[in-house]
A protein has these predicted regions:
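Intrinsically disordered, low-complexity regulatory regions in eukaryotic proteins
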Residues: 1-85
Length: 85
């Protein structure tokens, strides 16, 4: 089952479980649409894998299968990507 991490690893933007603007790779590295469009271009900066839209979990299922609360944020990532890595 997907973790549904709560934030973008690049900019720390909140990404609720029901958002349509989250992207993940096969390792569930999680990014927002803005960082994907500006820096990542559908490629995970951590593993080099493909980024795809993260599916939304129906609200009724979140009761028994909640999204993760663990935030993963790399403040250096955005600076590195902004330099044309």
């Amino acid at each position: 089952m997907l973790e549904l991490r709560p934030n973008c690893e690049c900019c720390d933007k909140d990404l609720p479980a029901d958002t349509a603007t989250a992207y993940i790779c096969s390792f569930e590295c999680t990014f927002c649409a803005e960082c994907n469009d500006q820096y990542l271009h559908l490629t995970c900066p951590n593993c080099g894998g493909e980024l795809v839209r993260r599916p939304r979990r129906p609200a009724a299922k979140l009761v028994n299968h909640p999204a993760s609360l663990q935030r993963i944020f790399n403040p250096d990532l955005k600076a590195t990507l902004g330099k044309g890595r």
